[in-house]
Amino acid sequence: LTALQWQDVDLKKRILTVRKTLQRIQCQDGVTKTKLVITEPKSESSKRKIPIPAHVIPLLLKFQGNKNEYLISGKETPTEPRTLQYRFSKILKNVNLPSVHFHSLRHMFASRCIRLGFDVKALSEILGHSSVEITLNRYVHSSFEQKIEYMSRLK
């Protein structure tokens, strides 16, 4: 998310293209411990095109920057992933919600998509997973309420 630039967003076609990733890696120079690097995603399936829902376009238009600016920072330099987590934690605290990691939003998104009836293969591709097993086993979490609804369908 932190590696996305406006050049990766086609508002007319409503497509977001994931073509790079930002990560903190260990330095081998002995001077600094870690550094931020932008690289290609870890697998071919991680490189992907994601349809943007129509209702999101007005929000993106409101914040749209030049093609070299990053979506999250609004600048030509990316937001440090740790900064994103810190800001997310601060928002959760301010609205009295339990602390969770920012990455948990991917899990919540996947579970919600399944509850809404998304095809697992399509969801797996949206998430950039190499297989539906990764999506189902690591990202999709069933709720007890959902189980109640399923069981009530039995007659």
Label each PLM-derived region with a short phrase:
Residues T2-A3, S124:
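Short, surface-exposed helix/turn micro-motifs that flank interaction/cofactor sites
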Residues L60-G65, M151-L154:
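Alpha-helix C-terminal capping segments
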Residues V9, L22, I57, L127-S152:
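Catalytic-site neighborhood detector that most strongly recognizes the C-terminal catalytic loop/helix
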